[in-house]
Each structure stands twice: as structure tokens, then as C-alpha cells.
Amino acid sequence: MAESRLPLQGIRVVEFVHVIMGPSCGLVLADLGAEVIKVEPLDGDHTRKLTASGAGFFPTFNRNKKSIAVDLKSKEGQEIVLKLIKSADVLTENFRPGAMDKLGFGYDALSKLQPELIYCSLKGFLAGPYENRAGLDETAQMMGGLAYMTGPVGRPLRAGASVNDVMGGMFAAIAILAAYVERTATGRGQYVKSALFENCAFLMGQHMTEGLMTGKPVVPMPDRIRAWAVYDTFRTSDGDLVFVGVVTDTQWKIFCDAFGLADLLADPALKTNPQRVEARPRVIPIVTALFAKMTKSELLAKCEKLGLPFAPITRPEDLYEDPHLKATGGLVDIRLPDGERAGETAQTTLFPITLGGERLGVRLNPPTLGEHTRELLAELGYASEQVDALLADSAVA
């Protein structure tokens, strides 16, 4: 779909963002067709330099964007950025509270100059007692209930991906699109905000309500009583783990018939799902012993044939060879912009939607630092000699 007209084509977004939350918002808008311009300091978004578990941040969340490097503290740099903002429909930022105001690019100042601007802040917290605290995905998970629900009792555990950061970026994109639709009716922009803590609390809503409904403390996932009798990971004869779920009465009959468990199917004490959940201490050892005699491939094939919920336990690197992702075009090549492998090609996952039956593609590789500085300055009316002078004075890079 990269060559077709995209839904947000013609919308310009200027982003002052780093790490994951802010860039993921821009990624959503960029993949949907918006022109997203990443404003970076002269030495680049520090996310470019991250290693270890942060090495994938920049190339993953910055495709389909343009990069301009500017000294935001210089007079020339501020003039450039102000012109860039005046050309934009949307501004996004995820710096510490107050940082944009100190630079002269806060909402109050810009909304007076450009009432139609949609200004989106992505922060740790919405307005309230916590709003000036530094916020991270990790802190939101810890104080928002997710770490408690993920680890066993007494051992809170961070989820295995930056779920709050990415979700916060998506919620911000939703808010921006809502504000854009409203602007078509009113002609005015507005200030919108997304926050890590609140989106984690939103995730916890189902468990908060669970506690109200049951009148009991909510138990973390590893230690809780499952909602269904068979809803676990099981080890196969070749040492692998496979998840299998049996979540309806119909599936229970199919499961028992196919796996030779006629005694369990006929047992009146296991007729309903609540009865089977109560009998898990009896049911699970039987199922565990049964699956331990099967290989992983045998169990997966049988569950797929029966239409039962199942899943192999997959590592991130295994996804590159996933037959479904490969067959549906879910993986795409990008050029790595930084680090020891700069210039090499790597695969990344696409935005997980289709429009008109087609995936959203990559129009621009993750940019090198200042890759589009000259192009954007020319669009803003700077002559080639002026750009040369700005580069020589280190106002831009």
C-alpha cells in the first residue's frame, strides 16, 4: 500500500520525542501516511546510541519519518523550528514537564501564534498530584498494577515488552486523530495528552472490576485460579512447551473425544466449566501426562485440526521464520541508520492492520541524523547559501 494514497497523506507532524512512547505515536501517524518530521539535537536523539535491550528502539519506531537536526538553544535554530511548526498540523513531544515551555515551544505560546495547531504531550501522568514526576514504562508498570499481575506473589515483574510506552503512543495517536476531525468542524486545534500511568490503570480495569465482582483480592496471573480447567502450558516429549486452552463446553467434548478421555467427559462432576475449574487439581495431571507422550509437532498439528486454541512458546528471534508473518507480508526490510551495522538491511514488523486488504508499507527508512535537513530548510524558503551558513555555524546538522 506504500504506493497508494494513504489516509493521513497531507498532514504534517513535527515531533520532539525520544525513546519509545513519543516515537511510537509518530510511527502510527507516519505509517498511516502523515509526513512526520523528527526534530533532533545536533548530536542526535540519544536513543540512537542505546545498546543492549535498547538497541532496537530507534530503528523500530522511526521509519517513515524525516530527520532535521537543530540547535534549539540558538536564535537561528529557534527561528527554523518555529517556521517548521507553523507549517505543521500537529506537534508531539515527550520531554520532561516544562521542558518545551522553557524552549518557548509550549502549548500556551504556540496556540496564540497558531490556533489551529494540535499539540500532543506524551507524559508519565495526566494532570494531577503526580504530573511533575518523571515517568517511565517501568514505573508505570510497578505503580499501575501490571508488574504485580505479571509476576508471582511477592515478585512483581515487568512485562516482556514496553507495553505502556507503545500503548501510550497509540492512545496519543487516537487523541490526535479525534482532535483533527474536530478541527475540520471548528477550525481550531487543541491540547491533547496521553500518559503512561493512566493507560496502565486502564489496562488494569478488568482486574479492578474483577475484585469488585468477586469480593476477593485479585491474584497475580502466575498464581491465580484459571477461568478454565485446561488453560496452561504443557511440556511435550521432546522437551518443548506448548500452550493449550479448552474454553467452551463444546471444546471440552471435542478435546475429550479426540484425546481418549471418555471417563472425564462422562464424569457428572465435570459437566460444567465451574465444576472443571474446581477439579483442576485432578484434571491437569491427567492432561500433563497425556501431552508428555506427544512431540511438539504432533500436539500442535492435532490441536490445529481440532480447532482448539493452542500456541508454541516462541522467542522474538523465532518470529523472523514464522510462516504466517512471512506469508502475509508482516515483515519488511529497513536500513539500519546507526551503530556498528549502520547501512545494513534488517527486518522489522509492520503496523498490525490492513486497509482495503493491504498492509501499510515502508516509504522511508529510519533516517540518519539530519538526513532531511537540507530538504526541509529549502521547503521553508532557505537558499542553498543560507543552509551552508547554518551548517557552518552549527545551527543545524
Language-model region placement:
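Terminal low-complexity tails and localization/encapsulation signals of metabolic enzymes
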Residues: M1-R12, R235-S237, D318-A397
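Oxidoreductase and adenylate-handling cofactor-binding alpha/beta cores
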Residues: G169-G189, F202-T214, C256-D263
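Short, well-structured beta-strand/strand-turn elements
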Residues: V36, E304-D318, A383-D388
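Mid-domain beta-loop-alpha active-site segment that forms a flexible
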Residues: S162-L177, L196-M204, V247, Q251
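Conserved Rossmann-fold dehydrogenase catalytic segment
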Residues: V153-A161, T184-C200, V219-R226, P268-K271
